[in-house]
Amino acid sequence: MKKTIIITGTSSGIGFSLAEYFGKQGHRVYGLSRKKADSKLFTSIPTDITEKSQIDRAIEEILSKENRIDILINNAGMGMVGAVEDSNKEEIMKLFNLNLIGAVQMMTVVMPKMREQKSGQIINISSIGSEMGLPFRGFYSASKSALDKVTEAMRYEISAWNIELCSLHLGDIKTNIAENRIKTAVSEPYKNIFYKVYSTMNSHVDHGVEPVEVAKYIEKLLLKNKWKAHYYFGKFGQKIGIPLKWILPQKTYENLMKKYNNLLEVKR
């Protein structure tokens, strides 16, 4: 059965791959992003999801054509790199405004229609990094963790209407995410540390999972009748970090994280 699917952040990266993949399957796919996407496989509607009025307009346009919304994939987001000490309020607010508030606004706008239908599926794209504080990505981890907690709370609130909702935690995916990160100015005390971690971070992305594999995973997830609150997708070496955090002594776990992020041999 063909579905009406809304995906945010579709001008590039994971969102673009998702939209094209489901478009090829014959679904009616609408991509929302600030820049209009160049694709014949889905309908692109320029939308800044940090502005609720723009979301309202986009959803109204979609409903005028389809009169239903089956699936929302909240994919739009950005990264942020830099030391906590070096970060400033404006950068932090910009990050949370997209990664958290934008996603919440999307859910609140589609919810009335899904409630009327007594059906719907919502996937909030999160990160394996939401389960831990990543060095020099602390606010990114925090923004995704905040979305996870909203997702958990909302699952209780909407359980009466047969609407499925989950967080999908991704590991490193091979995309151009580095181009869209907020990069905080690095102060002198952190320069030697930061650039080693930053180089390692980019290498992990360059060797990450192909975006189409995310689409295939989501395709299988959408076939499930009852969802868990959290799903995890990525390389084993990244996913295993989540249970290890709770199994290992804290100092041992922190040393593993330092090694993974190329921090063990850093001299200040």
Feature locations, PLM:
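N-terminal Rossmann NAD(P)H-binding glycine-rich loop of SDR-like oxidoreductase domains
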Residues: 11, 19
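The beta1-alpha1 cofactor-binding region of Rossmann-like NAD(H)/NADP(H)-dependent oxidoreductases
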Residues: 47-57, 89
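Substrate-binding pocket helix/loop in short-chain dehydrogenase/reductase
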Residues: 83-84, 91-93
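Active-site helix of classical SDR
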Residues: 107, 143-146
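A short, exposed helix-loop element centered on a Lys and neighboring polar residues
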Residues: 107-108, 152
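Residue(s) in the substrate-gating loop at a strand-loop-helix junction
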Residues: 127
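C-terminal beta-strand-loop-alpha-helix "lid" module of Rossmann-like NAD(P)-dependent dehydrogenases
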Residues: 156-205
